[in-house]
């Protein structure tokens, strides 16, 4: 099916976007009338080669004539009128600039294709995909769009005024040459001299009018360039800078509000207006060559106008070259900007000027620490080589939205070894996880006679040689992007700035919300603030140093705050993600707060919290119970670590957890998850059902079923030490458990025996918990 026919079948929201593609520059009626022929032409090639553009343009006029003949036979007066008007407009505007119409048509076809892809993606995702244009438009962005519309209108108005000036100049030139061809005016008779003087006066009046119009156009061009400069400043210094800051935030787990499509449309629109204005300035030079005179404003001002428009366009192209996706190892998508030597990483660059004629024209080269002066200034800084496919040509086919981009998928870093096989200098001023490096992308643009060198670079990356360095490397990325928007400060950690608790709290919450469905609550953050800053009432504005966050050990602990928290994040993602997403894990809570909220609850109420003493990350549960005298007791079990959770899910541990009292009776102390959720309701769906266990324990090829086993965690207690808990589960051998002889006979008759593994260590029943 033809592309145009597919577009007609889209929903209204997409058709509205289609209408926005077309204007008087390329009327939608013409797209409708000549749809098959238009789609059969190579407009992108024509936009880059003038001879082919001229041929296609004349063929376009011929197709219009043929369509007009068909409308004539159908007696369709309205279509005849519209088509005649369109042809006259195209001839007047593009006859001498066929590459311009080719570029406009090529862009429209690319935008149409992107629109179809967007609609198809939305359909595949059940209609849930939202188009970037549906994003919220701020008041500032509305003003920007109005300024862009004003620039486009002024460019078109100038185009019409240039034609008027050209026509007036042609009339003046014709009359002047006609008068001059009559011979030497001084030798004419009196009557002829009178006529000549009259014609001379007319020429003088025409020249005065021409001079006024030229001055008006020069003045309008100067004003237009100032308006373009203002819009460009808004785009580069505000919108693009805001996007880059949002990208920094997204890299460290913040909201992923980094779509570039709208910004690309704005920059492309401005670039098109600038190129059209440059052609208008060149047209002034042509007019000057035909007619010039003393005090000609074109002679005085055109060179400056040419210099300004070229400088504006160069700067716009340079700012439009961005890193769309920062370097990231595919195995660690949630931790970009940390790269391990010898491991592939990916990155993507994009040019936010979508000119189809640039497709497959720009070759991108990648290097690292190109401007290595700052890096080399740091004693002992490592140097690296980039291996893999480090050059690529930008194209529009690989991206889903037709943007001009290049994605590098097979890059690796290798450290340059010095003579002793180690770092360049053992007296390094920074540890390796504080070294920052820049990956640079370079290319050259040749467009309409201009050569523009483009260069952009990634955010600073940390290069590690062992995956155990990942936590500290990620802490460096967090601290850098939290506290600065300077994209090239590789010396940042020579004197790392101080952060506030408000900044740190937001970033810490992002570490959970970016990889799970739940961030940190105010109460959880307050507990973390207390661990970092000590007891306090209001932590807002409190300062936190880089060393306190990542390098110094916490009070009474042999590890830093960040190492402890990072292992908890890893624990959540790998072992207890579903429970965290449900909100069942209170996680970070002080012991005082824990005791306060549980002491008013009925026996059997429990909560889940993270261990404060486990460097590798641990989780425990605390419950309330009554002792023999009826006094309320708060008990905690020794934390479960990743090693234990590898063997048994935390939900199954909770569901099967028992206490063995002095009479060897097993009792479950866990009844209600705080505040009052029945244990089975909260955790039952995350455990295997009895029917699943039975089917797994039964061998269909065996004459008799296997004996069924069940692993549970048991804590032994005694009347003498009940109040000395927290209790520590330890491992004991598997035991065959029977209640009494009659129960055993009944079980044997049914062919089922239950084997229970108790987790206990009798020699350390009374060991105090490290929690």
Curated annotation (Swiss-Prot):
Gene Ontology terms: cellular component: cytoplasm; nucleus; plasma membrane; RNA polymerase II transcription regulator complex
GO molecular function, one term: DNA binding
Key word Transferase present: no
InterPro entries on file: p53-like_TF_DNA-bd_sf, SH2, SH2_dom_sf, STAT, STAT3_SH2, STAT_linker, STAT_N_sf, STAT_TF_alpha
Motif Essential for nuclear import boundaries: 150-162
SMART domains named in the record: STAT_int
Phosphotyrosine modifications at: 706
Record carries keyword Transcription regulation: yes
Coiled-coil positions: none
Compartment(s): Cytoplasm; Nucleus
Keywords of this entry: Activator, Cytoplasm, DNA-binding, Nucleus, Phosphoprotein, SH2 domain, Transcription, Transcription regulation
Residue ranges occupied by any SH2 domain in the UniProt entry: 580-670
Pfam families in the record: SH2, STAT_alpha, STAT_bind, STAT_int, STAT_linker
Family per similarity comment: Belongs to the transcription factor STAT family.
Function: Transcription factor that binds to the interleukin-6 (IL-6)-responsive elements identified in the promoters of various acute-phase protein genes.
Further information: Involved in the gp130-mediated signaling pathway.
Protein name, as recorded: Signal transducer and activator of transcription 3
Organism of this sequence: Gallus gallus
Gene encoding the protein: STAT3
């Amino acid at each position: 099916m033809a592309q145009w026919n597919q577009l007609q079948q889209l929903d209204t929201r997409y058709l509205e976007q289609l209408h926005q593609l077309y204007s008087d520059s390329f009327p939608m009626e013409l797209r409708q009338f000549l749809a098959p022929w238009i789609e059969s032409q190579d407009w992108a090639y024509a936009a880059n080669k003038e001879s082919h553009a001229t041929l296609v343009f004349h063929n376009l006029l011929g197709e219009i004539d043929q369509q007009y003949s068909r409308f004539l036979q159908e007696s369709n007066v309205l279509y005849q009128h519209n088509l005649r008007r369109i042809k006259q407009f195209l001839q007047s505007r593009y006859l001498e600039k066929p590459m311009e119409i080719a570029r406009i048509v090529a862009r429209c076809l690319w935008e149409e294709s992107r629109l179809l892809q967007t609609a198809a993606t939305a359909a595949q995702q059940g209609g849930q995909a939202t188009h970037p244009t549906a994003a919220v438009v701020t008041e500032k962005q509305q003003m920007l769009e109005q300024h862009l519309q004003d620039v486009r209108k002024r460019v078109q108005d100038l185009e019409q005024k240039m034609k008027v000036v050209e026509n007036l100049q042609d009339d003046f030139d014709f009359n002047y040459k006609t008068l001059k061809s009559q011979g030497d005016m001084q030798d004419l008779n009196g009557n002829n001299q009178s006529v000549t003087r009259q014609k001379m006066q007319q020429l003088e009046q025409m020249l005065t009018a021409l001079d006024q119009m030229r001055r008006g156009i020069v003045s309008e061009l100067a004003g237009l360039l100032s308006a373009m400069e203002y819009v460009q400043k808004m785009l580069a210094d505000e919108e693009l800078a805001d996007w880059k800051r949002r990208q920094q935030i997204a890299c460290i787990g913040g909201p992923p509000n980094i779509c570039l499509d709208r910004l690309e449309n704005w920059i492309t629109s401005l670039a098109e207006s600038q190129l059209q204005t440059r052609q208008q300035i060149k047209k002034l030079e042509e007019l000057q060559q035909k007619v010039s005179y003393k005090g000609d404003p074109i002679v005085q001002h055109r060179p400056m106008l040419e210099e300004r428009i070229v400088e504006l366009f160069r700067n716009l192209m340079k700012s439009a070259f961005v890193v769309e996706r920062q370097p990231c190892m595919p195995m660690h998508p949630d931790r970009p900007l940390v790269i391990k030597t010898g491991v592939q990483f990916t990155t993507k660059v994009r040019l936010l000027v979508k000119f189809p004629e640039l497709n497959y024209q720009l070759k991108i080269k990648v290097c690292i620490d190109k401007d290595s002066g700052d890096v080399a200034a740091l004693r002992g800084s490592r140097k690296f080589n980039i291996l893999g496919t480090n050059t690529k040509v930008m194209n529009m086919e690989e991206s889903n939205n037709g943007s001009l981009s290049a994605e590098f998928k097979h890059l690796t870093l290798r450290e340059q070894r010095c003579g002793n096989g180690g770092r360049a200098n053992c007296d390094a001023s920074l540890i390796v996880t504080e070294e920052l490096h820049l990956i640079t992308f370079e290319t050259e643009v040749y467009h309409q006679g201009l050569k523009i060198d483009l260069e952009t670079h990634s955010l600073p990356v940390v290069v590690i040689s062992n995956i155990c360095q990942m936590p500290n490397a990620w802490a460096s990325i967090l601290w850098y992007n939290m506290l600065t928007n300077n994209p090239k400060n590789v010396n940042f950690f020579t004197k790392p700035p101080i952060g506030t608790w408000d900044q740190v709290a937001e970033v810490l919450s992002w570490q959970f919300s970016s990889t799970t469905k739940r961030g940190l609550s105010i109460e959880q953050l307050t507990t973390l603030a207390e661990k970092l800053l000590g007891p306090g009432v209001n932590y807002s504005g409190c300062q936190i140093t880089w060393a306190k966050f990542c390098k110094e050990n916490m009070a009474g602990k042999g590890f830093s705050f960040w190492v402890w928290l990072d292992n908890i994040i890893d624990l959540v993602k790998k072992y207890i993600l579903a429970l965290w997403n449900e909100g069942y894990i209170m996680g970070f809570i002080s012991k005082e707060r824990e005791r306060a909220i549980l002491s008013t609850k009925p026996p059997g109420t429990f909560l889940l919290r993270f261990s404060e003493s486990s460097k590798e990350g641990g989780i425990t549960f605390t419950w309330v119970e009554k002792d023999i005298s009826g006094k309320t007791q708060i008990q905690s079990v020794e934390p479960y670590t990743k090693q234990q959770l590898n063997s048994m899910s935390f939900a199954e541990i909770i569901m099967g957890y028992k206490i063995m009292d002095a009479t060897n009776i097993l009792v479950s102390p866990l009844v209600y998850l705080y505040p009052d959720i029945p244990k089975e309701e909260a955790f039952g769906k995350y455990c295997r059902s009895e029917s699943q266990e039975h089917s797994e324990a039964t061998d269909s090829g065996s004459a008799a079923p296997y004996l069924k086993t069940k692993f549970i965690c048991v804590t032994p207690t005694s009347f003498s030490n009940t109040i000395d808990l927290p209790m520590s589960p330890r491992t004991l051998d598997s035991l065959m458990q029977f209640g009494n002889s009659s129960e055993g006979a009944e079980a044997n008759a049914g062919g089922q025996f239950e084997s229970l593994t108790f987790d206990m260590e009798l020699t350390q029943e009374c060991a105090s918990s490290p929690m």
